[in-house]
Structures are given as structure tokens and as C-alpha cells.
Amino acid sequence: MREKIDKRIPRYTSLIMPTFLALKELGGSGKNNEILDQIIKDLQISDEVVDIQHKGRTDKSELSYQADWARTYLSRYGVIENSARGVYTLSSPQL
């Protein structure tokens, strides 16, 4: 059974469009932490929510974990590319 996460944390499905928009705002390319910082800024997510840790881990926040999945789905559908380790780029400049 899946563990429930704090309801204040956006799920990956609701972070897909903000991730895409963050990459556009970053000029079409960004590192994982830059993308996450832009999402936090755009969605005005409080520090309290940002600091909630992913279950069983002390090195990753739940928000970061959910953002990782949003990037994974965008990548699977060809919207973004993992151009280098920890760097994502929009697949087409026209997007």
C-alpha cells in the first residue's frame, strides 16, 4: 500500500506543466535544482512545505521527489531531454 504524503505537497501530475514552464523561464535548459527553485518561486510554495522530507530519506525532500517524477514523464513523452547528468532541455525551441 502506498504511503500517504502531506496534502500540501503538489503531486507529480500537478507539477508537469509548472516544470515545463520553469524550463521555458530558464531559457529552455536547467539543472534539477534550478528547475525546482523556479517551480517553488512560480507556485509560491512555502519553506515549510519545501522542507518536508521524502519518507525514509534524509537527503531528498518530498517536493523534489515529486518534481523528479514530473521531469521523468515529460522526458518519456519527448517534451524534454536529459542533455547531461542533472540537466534537462526542452526538446524543441518552438515549445
List where the protein language model places each region:
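Positively charged, polyanion-binding regions of nucleic-acid-associated proteins
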Residues: 2-33
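A short, conserved structural fragment
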Residues: 75-85
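Short, positively charged loop/turn segments that connect secondary-structure elements
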Residues: 8-10, 40-68
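Short, amphipathic alpha-helical interaction segments positioned at domain boundaries
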Residues: 93-95
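Short, hydrophobic-biased segments on the C-terminal half of alpha helices
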Residues: 71-72
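Short, solvent-exposed beta-strand-terminating loops
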Residues: 29-43
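The feature represents the first ordered module of a protein
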Residues: 22-24, 36, 59-62
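Minor-groove-contacting beta-hairpin "wing" of winged helix-turn-helix DNA-binding domains
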Residues: 86-91
